[in-house]
Amino acid sequence: MNLDDFSDLIERPDGGLRRDAEERRERLSVPPGALGRLDELAEWLSAAQASVPVTAIRQPRVVLFAGDHGVAALNVSARPAGSAHLLVRAVLEGESPVAVLARRAGVPVRIVDAGLDCDPELLPTEVVRHRVRRGSGRIDVEDALTIEEAEQAVRLGMAIADEEADSGTDLVVLGDLSVGGTTPAAALIAALCGTDASVVTGRGGAGIDDLAWMRKCAAIRDSLRRARPVLGDQLELLATVGGADLAATTGFLLQSAVRRMPVILDGVVSTACALVGQRAAFRAPDWWLAGQVSGEPAQAKALDRMAIDPLLDHGVVVGEGTGALLALPLVQAAAALGAELPERPEPEPESEAAAEAAAAAENAGIEDVT
């Protein structure tokens, strides 16, 4: 598998239709510019949907890829290594932020186990049936995956994207459920942006102290040494310093762009996968939105590289798809306004007699003044 092949498969949203949407916006009853960024979102959606006016979002879906990362054994995360299945369980039981928000919004949540480090019996079959391997390798000293596992994970993500597109999903809220996942995400971003480990090392969704931050920075530094020799091959890069969930997320993003299915990115993990996807197919980011600022420096670096501006900045750092889901109502509002606001009525053309009378009255007024 060569991820660069996606470059020939992905087209940008229709630019002509976007211009048509912009022209229609000029004719709406609300003055141009009065709706701010909502106008831009509606025009983007219109091009993505190939529909003018834009169609309301009717079937959004939250998709969360789950996995454990061996690097968590270095105590670079506030959560114990191998405990990502507890995050999955919290979502399934409706006790996590993303589960609460999804329930309130009426949006279904799909969890895909790409690489959890737990017994499959602990979770429902529909979650664990796609697992590529049990946990990912410790990327500072070994590959996260074999090249065969990396390809399997990418194909898993592609298959999930196809299933969602075929079922009618018209917008995906994309997130992750991982322990240690922000470390390989930061390593991928640092490698692709050519920056140092200290620039991209954050404190994760659960927060870590200064000693853990230094351990995390050292792990990213050592991972970068292993990543740089394979920068020319994105699949090998994912195998070297990614992970099963990150490779699956990358495949999902690329195939979603092929299927013309828009995606809202969440935090640094999904953003890192998007950056890998951009390296493989430069048009792909035109299908993605960034839901929010996650507080991770690596996310800011990657979004700047892709020229994507986050929709929200409320200091929400919990991850797990929460920030992207918070942005969903904004996107839905933009679509609803673009679809339902009426156009201004065209002024009725003056009759020839009325035009002559108006001209005569104007001339008479001029003569009176003189």
Predicted regions and their residues:
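N-terminal loops that bind phosphate or other acidic moieties
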Residues: 1-370
